[in-house]
């Protein structure tokens, strides 16, 4: 049972709000954009390209994002990435106002969105230890993880109904969710940065060699990588929702949410 004192910590509560609305916006985007593109083109490869635009930037920028988070104010990094994502949601609403005319614009906006998201994970994870005491850290991590998992489950379910009710205007709603996240991170009391020794590329290479040669770490990471790659088949769910089950966007939202229910 989490300590009640933990929820009296204003910064920690704002941190939870930040994580909730970031998760809701990201999962809602996945439901909405997959539905709209497949509804317009009927091509499974277009869904595959959505997956690529979401994962390639995160893989390509993982070293850069880590360096930036280590050397820049994390709240400022989060603010900038949230603004970029919010602008891409508004741009998607504008591009799709008359339906899908050119998917290349959608892919470009998703690529920009994913480049910004590559900096969110390292920033949001590294900011938590500075918001709570060492004695409360384990509880704070547990609560934050549970809240995030719940939000990623509820997000697709709610997004399906929002998509059914508002169609392409759902992207304005997703942008408003990101606006709440921006307000939360702006009100957050950022912990003081700890001065760290400058890292060199030699340190990166040593880390990779360590992972490769460690008989416990490498297999564990490989299994996790394989599971994540197989999880990418979720982008194909619009095919099942639209062509096979014919359940509509609300059904698609439920299908994307149902695999997370057991985790919660």
Spans of model-derived segments:
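Alpha-helical transmembrane-bundle signature of multi-pass membrane transport and export proteins
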Residues: 1-264
């Amino acid at each position: 049972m989490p300590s009640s004192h933990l929820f009296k910590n204003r910064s920690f509560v704002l941190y939870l709000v930040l994580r909730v609305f970031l998760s809701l916006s990201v999962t809602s985007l996945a439901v909405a954009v997959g539905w709209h593109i497949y509804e317009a083109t009927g091509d499974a490869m277009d869904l595959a390209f959505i997956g690529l635009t979401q994962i390639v930037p995160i893989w390509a920028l993982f070293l850069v994002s880590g360096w930036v988070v280590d050397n820049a104010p994390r709240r400022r990094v989060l603010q900038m990435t949230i603004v970029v994502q919010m602008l891409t949601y508004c741009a998607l609403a504008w591009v799709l106002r008359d339906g899908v005319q050119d998917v290349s614009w959608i892919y470009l906006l998703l690529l920009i969105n994913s480049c910004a998201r590559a900096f969110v994970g390292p920033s949001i994870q590294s900011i938590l230890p500075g918001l709570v005491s060492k004695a409360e850290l384990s509880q704070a991590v547990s609560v934050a993880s549970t809240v995030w998992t719940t939000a990623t489950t509820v997000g697709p379910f709610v997004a399906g109904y929002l998509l059914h009710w508002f169609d392409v205007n759902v992207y304005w709603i997703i942008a408003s969710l990101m606006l709440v996240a921006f307000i939360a991170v702006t009100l957050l009391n950022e912990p003081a940065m700890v001065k760290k020794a400058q890292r060199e590329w030699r340190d990166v290479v040593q880390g990779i060699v360590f992972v490769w040669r460690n008989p416990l770490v490498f297999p564990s990471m490989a299994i996790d990588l394989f599971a994540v790659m197989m999880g990418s088949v979720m982008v194909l769910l619009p095919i099942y929702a639209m062509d096979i089950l014919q359940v509509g966007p609300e059904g698609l939202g439920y299908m994307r949410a149902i695999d997370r229910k057991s985790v919660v």
